[in-house]
């Protein structure tokens, strides 16, 4: 039997590496799904409803100039140990300038920084990466391979199409995706056109400042033991739940892009009163979380990540005089939010 030549072997290795890289993309999809789910807290559902949007898209950039207090923090204390929590919001403008002076000053007295969510890993096995890639490709479309127009109620499809024409006119693949993925992709397109991003650039800047000052960053690690099965579970999401997710995203894009921009400016200025008064819709995240949470496997991962963060925050307080944490305001506030849970446990909580 003839052996494989060096050129053929090289081609096979490059092909395997390419597929493994695509598997990493699928792994990122799991991480993104869990990160969004972890950030959702239904306590914000009582926020003022969003008002109808105008025909104007939000401006490309929010720049906050001059001397302002900047983003505000909550103080959680027990004895002489203090946990400072910087509440963040999403989305934020890609090019937003915000005052980080208070964070920099606090880092001089802080022993540890706690990020908002765990580091979610799926392992580095190349065979797992390949399986992830092919599973991810398989679940991109609905099981019956029907297009969105055939799956959605006519009224919802008309609204979806109007938003697509405005924010993603050249994205011809949107109609081929399953409802939940189509909704997520349309949201990304709309935010991009509006100069917004769901990436936590604030946390990125805080961690950069912490590293610069030599402050320890303690991020919990959560390994997904069965990432292929998680993707399969996402692929088995009931169609009705997926359509509800897409419908909530459509409603948010129709009403909330302007308020998103106003919230970003209020956050950067540290204007908590305005931030609290502005419309804030989380219906899309709640609906999409409900969709992916039909999987017990995904639901348990989300619950574990949320519980682990609170445990880590309390542990950090116990071992440090001063700890700085970053956390979504969606998770902080509300009757069932993190701050309420800490109060129940006997901690002193002071708001901005």
Task: List the model feature ranges, each with a label.
Residues 1-18:
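N-terminal secretory signal peptides that target proteins for export/translocation
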Residues 3, 18, 37, 279-283:
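Glycine-centered signal
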Residues 22-37:
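Bacterial N-terminal signal peptides
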Residues 288-352:
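A cross-kingdom marker for long, charged
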